[in-house]
């Protein structure tokens, strides 16, 4: 997938104060700290909805990860951004709440680096998603124990931010 140069990320300091905007690719090329979010959706059985990233993703293609993740738009709340991407990637909307945030930095083989202040959002949904094949290759529901064990056994099949 081609990432438009117009797509902007919100640059932040380590306390999540906005300090500017930058093109998404440039921020990843220069490893500049920027705001992001990760959504974790559970069903009534306590299983986590995982997605396999589409083959066309510019980094981490075909790797398994949390339900969805992306970057907030300028002026968009964390909750609003999470619900927007749930709809765009997984084809459903549900209430989410923010649990915590953390900073991580992960370089990739393609010269890009994720350096994000990541807001973690949680929600609940019990139906099958209607995945957007441009964003998501596949999905599965797994218990947290099974996720933990599979990451230990197959770490290269999961995204850095999910491990």
Stretches with model-predicted labels:
Residues 2-38, 44:
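Acidic, metal-coordinating catalytic segment for phosphate/diphosphate chemistry
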Residues 9, 47-48, 139-140:
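A residue-level structural signature of the nucleotidyltransferase/glycosyltransferase Rossmann-like core
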Residues 25, 62, 103-108, 112-163:
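Nudix hydrolase/Nudix homology domain
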Residues 26-37, 47-84:
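Conserved Nudix-box catalytic region and its N-terminal flanking loop in Nudix hydrolases
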Residues 39, 68, 98, 119-121:
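A structural signal for short, well-ordered beta-strand segments
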Residues 89:
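Short alpha-helical functional segments enriched in proximate histidine and acidic residues
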Residues 92-101:
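A short coil-to-beta-strand element that immediately follows conserved catalytic motifs
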